[in-house]
Amino acid sequence: MTQSGGTNTGALWGGRFASGPAAAMAALSKSTHFDWALAPYDIRASKAHARVLHKAGLLSDADLDTMLAGLDGLAADVASGAFVPAETDEDVHGALERGLIDRVGAEVGGRLRAGRSRNDQVATLFRMWLRDGVRRVAAGVLDVVDALVEQAAAHPDAVMPGKTHLQAAQPVLLAHHLLAHAHPLLRDIERLRDFDKRAAVSPYGSGALAGSSLGLDPEAIAADLDFDAAAANSIDATSARDFAAEAAFVLAMIAVDLSRMAEEVIIWSTPEFGYVTLADAWSTGSSIMPQKKNPDVSELTRGKAGRLIGNLTGLLATLKAQPLAYNRDLQEDKEPVFDSVAQLELLLPAIAGLVGTLTFHTDRMAELAPAGFTLATDIAEWLVREGVPFRVAHEAAGACVRAAEARGVGLDALTDEEFAAIDPALTPRVREVLTVQGSIASRNAKGGTAGTRVAEQLAEVRAAAQQARAWIA
């Protein structure tokens, strides 16, 4: 079988081998097409590692200066695109070592590998990249929250039909409903912040699995790279990818939360509902039907939610049967997570733009708010306040619905005599609760849809979003 080059061409191993890998083997092992994203982090970590080698007496002052200067030059060339992986480079680590040696020579450049393995190296770089990545995602999520907040603030008194099972349930304020989408997104931010605490542990210094015998200082390199601590167990540090799975879950959860909101926008924009009109900038047309205005942002959101769920399940399947410590299966850990971050970075600005430019047809929503006998619960609770047991009150309210349905009218159109015939406790005063405004105002417990409570929720969401912005910064 055809061999590709020497025993160590473009790779960080080979001395034990009499010949290089077969071409198909080299192609299978190659990862620069995706792990090049780690290059800036690799160089930053290499500089920190060089300082630790110097501290341990393994690198002279002159060699340290030469190495740091070479790494700075390499970083600039990577950023500009002047230095890219060669076809023979197996991975980002081998490519960058080649680049460093080209700049400072093999005598100095070859010293950098002492005391580190690709195992602890990639585990550290992945954490560094992901900690930055989730902050970018969090910023996009907060833009969506801000759009929801702005729409809620712009419609403080608008009412709409609240639904369960997609059936008419009770009238609510539109602002209340919009903020109900903001809260899960804020919880997603909290999950990202919580993830970051566990991701802020540096595997550097763990070597392949057993740690280092060279007197290196893992805590020093952890601090240099803005980690909170060095890993407590070198075997765990090099093989654990629960941090990646945790991040993949939160990213998928964000997509699911966005997808639920997107589904409602799709429904609301249909002629049958008529709650919203989509802005032209966030819609597309049809190649054959001139009248169409399609909710593609929302539909792509649903599609990408499935994609991110797939990334999560694929990663978990990769991890499920690996013995300790590192296994090459873990080459498959990065692409799903990289993709989840990339898809959200693409999606979130579009969702924020869509939500922020929705035109709400509040008259239509108000018209439908009492439809479907949404005030039936108010009758039952009015009876409870009159001293009627809820079981009896529930039956009476249901009978009111049945009577109104038989006549083809709303609950407020029942006569005093009809109410009294259903239950003597249903006096004319029951009409006090048979308005949408009265129903909404009565829901004044914490978290409820009364205007005063929704105003409180709006202030709380704004404050939480502002606090989350501080974490990103």
UniProtKB/Swiss-Prot annotation:
Pathway: Amino-acid biosynthesis; L-arginine biosynthesis; L-arginine from L-ornithine and carbamoyl phosphate: step 3/3. It comes from Nocardia farcinica (strain IFM 10152). The lineage of its organism: Bacteria, Bacillati, Actinomycetota, Actinomycetes, Mycobacteriales. Keywords: Amino-acid biosynthesis, Arginine biosynthesis, Cytoplasm, Lyase. One of its GO terms (cellular component) is cytosol. It is found in: Cytoplasm. InterPro entries: Arg_succ_lyase_C, Argininosuccinate_lyase, Fumarase/histidase_N, Fumarate_lyase_CS, Fumarate_lyase_fam, Fumarate_lyase_N, L-Aspartase-like. CDD domains: Argininosuccinate_lyase (cd01359). This is Argininosuccinate lyase. SUPFAM superfamilies: L-aspartase-like. Its EC number is 4.3.2.1. Gene3D superfamilies: Fumarase/aspartase (C-terminal domain), Fumarase/aspartase (Central domain), Fumarase/aspartase (N-terminal domain). The keyword Cytoplasm applies. It is an enzyme of class 4 (lyase). GO terms for molecular function: argininosuccinate lyase activity. Signal peptide: none annotated. PROSITE patterns: FUMARATE_LYASES.
